[in-house]
């Protein structure tokens, strides 16, 4: 079976992408990588272009373009470049891993395919513990429509392994129709639509962060620094994130039992596939951000940290943040 890794990037996200590819190869992963242009100025880094097959939207079929335009008709809260990840479903690969650029590989991703038998999608995140607040304006409606537990199958669309089948495209088009019929329920971005498609099509999902595997959370915000992450991987302490604790408290005693087994992992090595720096306005000021500079020389890395600090001191970061908030408000 043909398989590989799909990325989407442009010149603006180039340094993230460069670091991601560095971490993928450093882990020992030799899977082929295809990079789709996000739009705007394309990447020009030799370090990237030497490792990838570079593709543009025009390299895909007309059916693929029609599909993207259909998604765009309801997914109005994100740039169209975010939707180009879905072009991977129209490639000649049978299986693929899609990854956002603000991710660092912490293991050889070829190992993820060992878990794919019998599943449509394999992923490793704790999105399910947020109880739908980032995917839906009315999350309670999801369980009313699709049944109890439907929010607990949430996926972070930024990193997932997919075993393709034609039904997936049909289900995602059906999810577009569902968005049109229920405009007040979902947030208008790709992650919520993907989740609705999995519910409509009853996709077989495997979340490695759930029992029986209990992998560590892949969100960088759950770790203060590199030491805390390393100790968590070594099983030095029980890792229950803030969102997990909140979600766990809402469960019945019976439903808590599989998750209480997490305590048995203490002093045993625990797996983690990657770190995802999603939901971050900038990278650099926090200790755990160090991984995002792994591909850079010591001098370049320190200069980037210096620029971040200067931007904070001169209130440049604050001003940029306020401008973004105003733009989001005006575009609503």
Q: For the regions a protein language model found, what residue spans apply to each?
A:
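Active-site-proximal specificity loops/subdomain of glycosyltransferases
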Residues: 44-91
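N-proximal low-complexity "stem/linker" segments adjacent to membrane-targeting elements
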Residues: 1-21
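GT-A fold catalytic core of metal-dependent nucleotide-sugar glycosyltransferases
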Residues: 83-133
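Conserved catalytic core of nucleotide-sugar-dependent glycosyltransferases
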Residues: 114-178
């Amino acid at each position: 079976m043909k398989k590989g890794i799909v990325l989407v990037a442009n010149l603006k996200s180039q340094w993230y992408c460069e670091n991601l590819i560095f971490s993928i190869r450093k882990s020992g992963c030799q899977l082929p990588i295809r990079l789709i242009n996000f739009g705007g100025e394309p990447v020009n880094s030799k370090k990237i272009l030497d490792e990838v097959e570079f593709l543009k939207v025009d390299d895909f079929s007309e059916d693929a373009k029609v599909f993207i335009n259909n998604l765009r008709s309801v997914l109005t809260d994100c740039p169209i470049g975010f939707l180009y990840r879905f072009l991977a479903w129209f490639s000649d690969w049978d299986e693929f891993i899609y990854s956002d650029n603000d991710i660092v590989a912490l293991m050889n991703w070829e190992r993820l395919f060992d878990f794919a038998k019998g599943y449509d999608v394999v992923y490793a995140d704790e999105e399910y513990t947020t109880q739908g607040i980032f995917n839906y304006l009315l999350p309670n409606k999801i369980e009313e429509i699709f049944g109890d537990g439907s929010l607990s199958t949430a996926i972070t669309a930024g990193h997932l392994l997919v075993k393709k089948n034609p039904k997936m495209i049909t289900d995602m088009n059906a999810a577009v129709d569902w968005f049109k019929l229920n405009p007040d329920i979902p947030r208008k971005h790709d992650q919520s639509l993907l989740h609705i498609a999995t519910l409509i099509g009853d996709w077989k999902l495997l979340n490695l962060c759930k029992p029986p595997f209990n992998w560590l959370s892949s969100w960088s915000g759950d770790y203060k620094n590199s030491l805390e992450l390393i100790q968590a991987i070594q099983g030095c302490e029980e890792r229950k994130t803030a969102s997990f604790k909140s979600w766990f408290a809402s469960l019945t005693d019976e439903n808590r039992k599989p998750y209480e087994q997490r305590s048995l992992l203490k002093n045993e090595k625990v797996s983690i596939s990657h770190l995802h720096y999603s939901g971050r306005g900038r990278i650099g000021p926090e200790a755990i951000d160090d991984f995002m500079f792994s591909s850079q020389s010591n001098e370049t890395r320190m200069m980037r940290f210096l620029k971040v600090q200067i931007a904070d001191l001169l209130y440049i970061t604050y001003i940029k943040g306020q401008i973004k908030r105003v733009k989001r408000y005006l575009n609503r």
